[in-house]
Amino acid sequence: VATVDCSDYPRPDCTLEYMPLCGSDNKTYGNKCNFCNAVVDSNGTLTLSHFGKC
C-alpha cells in the first residue's frame, strides 16, 4: 500500500510542481501538498490510491 506522510499539513500555499497522486476518491491531485491538504480537509478519510494520475 502506498502511503504519504501528511503530518506537516495543512499548508496555506502549495507550489505548482506537478507530481500527480491518485486519491481514494478517484481524483488526481497535482502534488503532495494539494493531496495532503485534501486529506486534512477530509478528516483522514481520504487516502492515497497510487502515485501518478488516476
UniProtKB/Swiss-Prot annotation:
Q: Which residues are glycosylated?
A: N43
One Pfam family in the UniProt entry: Kazal_1
Q: Where in the cell is it found?
A: Secreted
A GO term, aspect molecular function: serine-type endopeptidase inhibitor activity
Q: Which domain of life is it from?
A: Eukaryota
One GO cellular component from the entry?
extracellular region
> Keywords assigned by UniProt?
Disulfide bond, Glycoprotein, Protease inhibitor, Repeat, Secreted, Serine protease inhibitor
UniProt-annotated site: Reactive bond 3, residues: L16, E17
Q: Which residues form the Kazal-like domain?
A: 4-54
| Disulfide partners | C6-C36, C14-C33, C22-C54
Main location class: secreted
Coiled coil start-end: none
Decide whether keyword Cell membrane is in the record: no
* Keyword Repeat in annotation: yes
What UniProt notes about the protein's domains is: Avian ovomucoid consists of three homologous, tandem Kazal family inhibitory domains.
Name it: Ovomucoid
Organism annotation = Dendrocygna eytoni
